[in-house]
Amino acid sequence: MSNVDHAEIAKFEALAHRWWDRESEFKPLHDINPLRVNWIDERAGLAGKKVLDIGCGGGILSEAMAQRGANVTGIDMGEAPLAVARLHQLESGVAVDYRQITAEQMAEEMPGQFDVVTCLEMLEHVPDPASVIRACHRLVKPGGQVFLSTINRNPKAYLFAVIGAEYILQLLPRGTHDFRKFIRPSELGAWSREAGLEVKDIIGLTYNPLTKHYKLANDVDVNYMVQTQREA
C-alpha cells in the first residue's frame, strides 16, 4: 500500500502556482527557510554533499541547499509542485534534480547513496510517518545525517499552528494541518531510533506575531527540527 494521502497531495496541487510568491500562503516557508538551511548547513556542511530532499514541493529548500554547494535531488508526489519547481529552476539557474517518487520507492532504488537526507514539514502529511523515517535511514550513507521537522501535538500547538496560523493570523489556508497527525518529539525520537538513527540535536522554531519574525529557540512546543545520524 502506498504511503501517500491523496487528499493532502490535492491541497498543495491547488496552491502550487503560488509556491514562489513570497506574499502567498507559502510566505511562512520562505520566512523560515534561511533559518532551516543555516541550521542544517552548520551541522552537515552542505558544500559538495549529495543531498536528498523528501517532500520538496516547489523546491524552496532544495534550491537553497543547492546554492550552498550541495548536489540536490528533490522528490515529491505532487505533480503540480514539481512542475513549479522545475519552472523556477529555469528562472533561477539553480541545479536540482526533481523526481516524482515516494521516499520508500527511492530507498529501493538508491539505498545508502546520500550524505544528507532532509524531510521537513512533510511527516504530518503522510499516513505512516515511521515508514518515511525508515526510508530515510536506508537512503542515507553510514555516518550520514537525516534532518526532520514537524509540529508537536499538544494544546499549545493546536492553538498556535491551527487556530492561530490558519484562522486568526491567516498565515496558512484553513485545513492545511490536521492536529491528529501532529507528532510529539518523543514519538519522532522513538521512530528514529527504531529505524537505526541516533538523535543528535533538537531545536524549536518560534513565531512572534507582533514582529512577524521567526527564530530558532529551545521551545519545541509547536514547530521543531531534529538532527539524526546513521551509525558509521
UniProtKB/Swiss-Prot annotation:
Q: List the molecular function annotations (GO) for this entry.
A: 2-polyprenyl-6-hydroxyphenol methylase activity; 3-demethylubiquinol 3-O-methyltransferase activity; polyprenyldihydroxybenzoate methyltransferase activity
SUPFAM superfamilies attached to this UniProt entry = S-adenosyl-L-methionine-dependent methyltransferases (SSF53335)
Tell me its EC number(s), please.
2.1.1.222, 2.1.1.64
List positions binding S-adenosyl-L-methionine.
Answer: 36, 55, 76, 120
One Pfam match: Methyltransf_23
The pathway that the record names for this protein is:
Cofactor biosynthesis; ubiquinone biosynthesis
Keyword Plastid in the entry? The reply is no
As its record notes, the protein acts as a catalyst of: a 3-demethylubiquinol + S-adenosyl-L-methionine = a ubiquinol + S-adenosyl-L-homocysteine + H(+); a 3-(all-trans-polyprenyl)benzene-1,2-diol + S-adenosyl-L-methionine = a 2-methoxy-6-(all-trans-polyprenyl)phenol + S-adenosyl-L-homocysteine + H(+)
Q: Which UniProt keywords apply?
A: Methyltransferase, S-adenosyl-L-methionine, Transferase, Ubiquinone biosynthesis
Q: What class of enzyme is it?
A: transferase
Q: Name one GO biological process term.
A: methylation
Note the superkingdom of the native organism: Bacteria
Family stated for the protein in its record: Belongs to the methyltransferase superfamily. UbiG/COQ3 family.
Name the job this protein performs: O-methyltransferase that catalyzes the 2 O-methylation steps in the ubiquinone biosynthetic pathway.
Which PANTHER family did the record assign? Answer: METHYLTRANSFERASE, UBIQUINONE BIOSYNTHESIS O-METHYLTRANSFERASE, MITOCHONDRIAL
NCBIfam families under this entry?
A: UbiG
Q: What is this protein called?
A: Ubiquinone biosynthesis O-methyltransferase
The organism's lineage?
Bacteria, Pseudomonadati, Pseudomonadota, Gammaproteobacteria, Pseudomonadales
Name the gene. ubiG
